């Protein structure tokens, strides 16, 4: 808008500086500027020679004037109803030829080129004007195409400033206005072909909006054009789909409008207000409409009245106000409208029901990020609260708004500081309370205050002024009901009850005398007769005050004597002996009801206090009925009386009643033979004792429950100590007795509770034990379950849950007296051992013997996550039942059984402390690893079944009916041999022969063929997942070359041998597959072993540790050489390696036993040989 104003000023200055120019289309020379150094994108070539500048200017003005003269002969406004003929069309073509000939005489090449470019579109618009004069019922298709093309060209080019000047010279503004008027007059708001007409009218509005931007003469000409504003109003009301573009046009026309333009645009205010109400849910429409209304609202009071009187318009504006930054443009327009509208609302009493809503919503805009929004909001608030005390009070009650106003006082913008100053001055004006007057309720007394009383009540000490915006304004300036009335009228008046409105006033806003609550300010002019009556009333009041003072002095002396007598007594009267039915003896307050300057200055002219002790005071008719002596005790039963009453801890603040007390304790104790009665308040629950040192009870106000301490009594056998002898406050406080079972603050420990505490302690110790892999608390992996305690057939459970092996007692286990020491020692030992950084395994030998301990294992320098997982699988495995259900094998020695069992475990990556052949080495080399391995007895039955990685326990059915009999059709091997008895359960899993990419061709072929025929890689699936297989097939074929291949399932499953096993629980956890790459090794002793064994190749997804493979192979070789098998079958062995292990390359050993072979590893498979 700023650019438009500058352009308007330039155009206006140029028009006034050339009085001899004709027409309203006199414009600046295209490309010229007041600043010669500034050049536009499309500018004329200016000659530096000064003699030619004046000549060119005169020539340009001569061309523009001649073109304007030719166009003025058309008289569109006067000949609008004249039906054109063919002769008129010929004259129009001759006119266009003359205009073209004038353009050719333009000396400026760039200007001449722009005029020629804009001429065809302007000629087309004029031709359509002549066509529409014929009032066609159904226009031809050429009408839409030609007019639509011309309008698109004009809208596209009208964004340039130079084109807008040239188009104005060629008369495009009048032509477009006439086309719009004739278009609406000829076709109206059609229902048929509405899209074409709507597009044409939308393009006309866009073209006029661009052409009038920054052109004040064009705006003035368009506003004064006959019938144009009426046509726009009709379109806004009847065509809501194109209201947005015409609202933008009105916005441009109303910006910086003069009086004539404002008067011409006044009919559009009502139409735009209605459109804002109808389209309030359409954001872009409302934004354009409110922008136009913002400009129009500042034109005249009539426009403001029209906006206010439009139904629901102010409600829509109030609902639009929001501090959300996304609607800043919309809120700026709405707040701008309200800034102007509030000026009209401040001068009349209309729309009172909407003012509070407007104020409330505008207060939320004080923190807006838009300076325009904040300025408009402050201006609207200042106008609305200028003469409205209710709105002022509404703002004072909003502490956040007052704080934000104080913040805006220091703004850097002058307009904001000025607006805030106006608002704060209105809020802080001393006379703002005058607008809150209330009429008299009773008595008919219009004013009876004397001048001294009027000065007293209006002084700074008499009332809290409203100068501070933080304080509430006074609710009334006249008494209701009247106070200073004639005594004859006073006797007929009813005394107001505490629940009346007068008693609801705050203390510092009311004055109470003679039983009536009265407001503190009184501003009313009194005639002499009223002043005389009030002086008489004042004299009567002074006499009453003197009598009250005499009575007050007598009551004060009696009260002081009573206090001295109580202090001289050795034993005080107990306050609890007063029953609720007995009226308390009320003391007298000596410093109240005395109208002195001190009281008026310190108590805000209010002679009523919360602690008034005068029985005949005005408190009997007021809202406060407290009789507590505030001068003597202002704590209101919230503080203890003596040092002994101060509790040592919150647990002492409990109810301790009916305990014997010492007769000489203090005034808080009850006599020994006197029944203890509680002094409870009427509104409390009745359980808390509220006795204090004061002589009167406290009547609660507004059902307020006062928190108090319980009465603390001392037992008879407790030694009484003074405050100087007290070592701690606990010495005189009652405590529970451990010998006598009674209710108190502490529990009494007996047999049953002690047992429960033992169980609780046990469980706490068990829960707090570390959860590392060395803790026996963890569960054993089901795959390792049964390797250590195959004799137990119970379900799988942690070692701590077994009653025979658990070192921690359960609730069902009751320890005997002679076993407590042993159990404690064992618990201590287990706790110490559990914190050791080693993995522990409980020996089954010691577990069966009744003693348990954890054997240490070799130290390690580092542990990986996979080592921790493998260690957890091996913890307390000896105490788990065996779910394999198989023995080691036939004809194998205990050492071989032990070897096979230890090799079946998941060993550690370092292979130094694995569960490999350490058990076997214990027999042959007792000095090397006897203390570092698990303790296994020779008579233990070792499970030598396949590792659980080869078995899918989820849904496997071990019945013969479950096996797939169609396996022979899927896979037929001509070189295979049928075994009716299945695979020999005596299995030896030997990893010495590795099938890899660079191995033997036979092994490679078998490896690839087995993997390809299976249809899927042999990847394991954890138990419980959706991809678990219902079962696997039984092995049918065995290859002739001596390598028996167990069939691989078609989908992700595990392998299992034919031997039937019991159904394994589905909830057994499985370790995720983490394959590692393997390397095959060639040993010199392979031929000897292959002659004695026939192995079978199985592909599983578990990785293998090559170092462990070599070590096991060497141990097995030594054992076979030392004690050859009778049947020619080597000992069983099973290796399951830990995850994430890759053996570093090694060189050829010196003894020539192992040679390095470069093989291509296959990370997907691990070769396991079975004999």
Swiss-Prot record:
Q: Where is this region: Required for interaction with bar-1 and hmp-2?
A: 1-481
On the tree of life, the source organism's domain of life is Eukaryota
Q: Which GO terms describe its biological process?
A: asymmetric cell division; cell fate specification; cell migration; embryonic morphogenesis; endoderm development; negative regulation of canonical Wnt signaling pathway; negative regulation of microtubule depolymerization; negative regulation of Wnt signaling pathway
A cellular component term, taken from the record's GO annotations: catenin complex
Give residue spans, biased composition: Low complexity: 15-26
Q: Where is there biased composition of kind Basic and acidic residues?
A: 857-874
Outline the segment boundaries, as ranges, of region: Disordered.
1-54, 587-617, 662-699, 720-741, 767-822, 837-936, 995-1030
Q: Does the keyword Cell division apply?
A: yes
Instruction: Describe, as the record does, how this protein assembles with itself and its partners.
Output: Interacts (via N-terminus) with bar-1 and hmp-2; the interaction with hmp-2 is relatively weak. Interacts (via C-terminus) with pry-1 (via N-terminus). Probably associates with bar-1, gsk-3, pry-1 in a complex.
Its job: Has a role in endoderm cell specification and pharyngeal development. Required for the migration of epithelial cells, organization of the anterior seam cells and ceh-13 expression during embryo morphogenesis. Prevents hyperactivation of the Wnt signaling pathway during endoderm development, probably by preventing hmp-2 nuclear translocation. During larval development, apr-1 is required for expression of lin-39 in P3-8.p. Shown to negatively regulate Wnt signaling in vulval precursor cells.
How is this protein named in the record?
Answer: APC-related protein 1
In its UniProt entry, the species of origin is given as Caenorhabditis briggsae
Per UniProt, what is the name of the gene that codes for the protein in this document?
A: apr-1
